């Protein structure tokens, strides 16, 4: 789908100050390096400032300070990246699904599907499920018994919702995501693992986004819960009984063990792992590949592990780490000897 808007229209949408011709046609968005004369770009990161003067973009979203001295067309805004985020949807070429149920879809007789919803080819909607207004269910999706998908939801092809999953409004779920799979619960009987039925469900709030191949397990007794506005990247594992607070964001490959609770407005970078049964307070940032082994009670930034270094240096550091315990013992012995020498009856300035 091709979209064209004028600079004047974009300025009105954003409440921006326009420097340039209102009638200039904008057909899309691109980076400063790649944008052409009918495309809009933006400068949000100072490290890309070097590309601004030579950009061929038809116009650029800029802060007032960056717009000073720039000869090209500009839309001056307080936050160029946020402005870009807002107008990106105007130029999104994603196909719009048409309302209706595809003939190949299998829909239970007692399932409730709003007339404005779109149900794609070979989708399955089981007994008691409810699909809200303007929901789009992609091809080959599975919606289990008694699931609820709130209005405006968008499920890409091959999303799986097991039974008793409740999805809020305007939720986006990407392909391969599995919501409501059985949690990893077993009891050990003399070395043999006995399965524990996972009889809870999953409850997901409004405006949540769930990435490709992410798994959210159902609760053992009560629901696993994802708060409003949570953003989950690809290949994240959320175990049974986990609770995630509103507007928390997680990058790819985060793994959260069972019954851990994460607060609101937290950010977990890629590859972070959390053990089970801990609490993370609000407004916490955890850097990539950190292993969180205990509760965090104070807002702030946290890290673990070692940063990248040349291989030879890393090998030396690793070798030293193996000897830390022995070195600590030797240091304690040395401190005792120093104390003995310095306090062994020698004269002092007061003696």
From Swiss-Prot:
Broad EC category: transferase
Catalytic activity: a UDP-3-O-[(3R)-3-hydroxyacyl]-alpha-D-glucosamine + a (3R)-hydroxyacyl-[ACP] = a UDP-2-N,3-O-bis[(3R)-3-hydroxyacyl]-alpha-D-glucosamine + holo-[ACP] + H(+)
Pfam hit, one: LpxD
EC number: 2.3.1.191
Gene Ontology CC terms: membrane
GO biological process, one term: lipid A biosynthetic process
Role: Catalyzes the N-acylation of UDP-3-O-acylglucosamine using 3-hydroxyacyl-ACP as the acyl donor. Is involved in the biosynthesis of lipid A, a phosphorylated glycolipid that anchors the lipopolysaccharide to the outer membrane of the cell.
Top-level taxonomic group: Bacteria
HAMAP family hit by this protein: LpxD
Keywords attached to this entry: Acyltransferase, Lipid A biosynthesis, Lipid biosynthesis, Lipid metabolism, Repeat, Transferase
Stored PANTHER family: UDP-3-O-ACYLGLUCOSAMINE N-ACYLTRANSFERASE (PTHR43378), UDP-3-O-ACYLGLUCOSAMINE N-ACYLTRANSFERASE 1, MITOCHONDRIAL-RELATED (PTHR43378:SF2)
UniProt xrefs under InterPro entries: Hexapep, Hexapep_transf_CS, LpxD, Trimer_LpxA-like_sf, UDP_GlcNAc_AcTrfase_non-rep
Catalytic residues (positions): 240 (proton acceptor)
Entry similarity comment: Belongs to the transferase hexapeptide repeat family. LpxD subfamily.
Protein name (database record): UDP-3-O-acylglucosamine N-acyltransferase
């Amino acid at each position: 789908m091709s979209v064209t808007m004028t600079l004047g229209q974009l300025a009105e949408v954003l409440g921006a100050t326009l420097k340039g011709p209102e009638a200039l046609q904008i057909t899309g968005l691109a980076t400063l390096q790649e944008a052409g004369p009918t495309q809009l770009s933006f400068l949000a990161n100072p490290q890309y400032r070097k590309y601004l003067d030579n950009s061929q973009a038809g116009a650029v979203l800029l802060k007032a300070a960056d717009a000073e001295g720039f000869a090209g067309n500009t839309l001056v805004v307080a936050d160029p990246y946020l402005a870009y985020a807002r107008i990106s949807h105007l130029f999104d070429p994603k196909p719009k699904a048409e309302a209706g149920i595809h003939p190949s879809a299998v829909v239970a007789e007692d399932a409730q599907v709003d007339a404005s919803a779109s149900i794609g080819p070979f989708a399955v909607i089981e007994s008691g499920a409810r699909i809200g207004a303007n929901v789009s269910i992609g091809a080959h999706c599975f919606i289990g018994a008694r699931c609820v998908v709130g209005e405006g939801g968008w499920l890409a092809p091959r999303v799986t919702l097991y039974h008793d999953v409740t999805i809020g409004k305007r939720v986006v779920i990407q392909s391969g995501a599995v919501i409501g799979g059985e949690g990893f619960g077993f009891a050990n009987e003399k070395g043999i693992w006995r399965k524990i039925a996972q009889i809870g469900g999953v409850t997901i709030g409004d405006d949540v986004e769930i990435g490709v191949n992410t798994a959210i397990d159902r609760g053992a007794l009560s629901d696993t819960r994802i708060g409003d506005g949570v953003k989950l990247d690809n290949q994240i594992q959320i175990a049974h009984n986990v609770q995630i607070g509103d507007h928390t964001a997680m990058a790819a490959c985060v793994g959260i063990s069972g019954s851990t609770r994460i607060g609101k407005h937290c950010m977990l970078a890629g590859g972070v792992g959390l053990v089970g049964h801990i609490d993370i307070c609000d407004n916490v940032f955890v850097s990539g590949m950190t292993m969180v082994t205990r509760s965090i009670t104070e807002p702030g930034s946290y890290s673990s592990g070692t940063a990248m270094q040349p291989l030879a240096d890393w090998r030396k550091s690793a070798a030293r780490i193996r000897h830390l315990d022995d070195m600590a013992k030797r240091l304690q012995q040395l401190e005792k000897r120093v104390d003995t020498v310095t306090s062994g009856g020698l004269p002092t300035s007061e003696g």
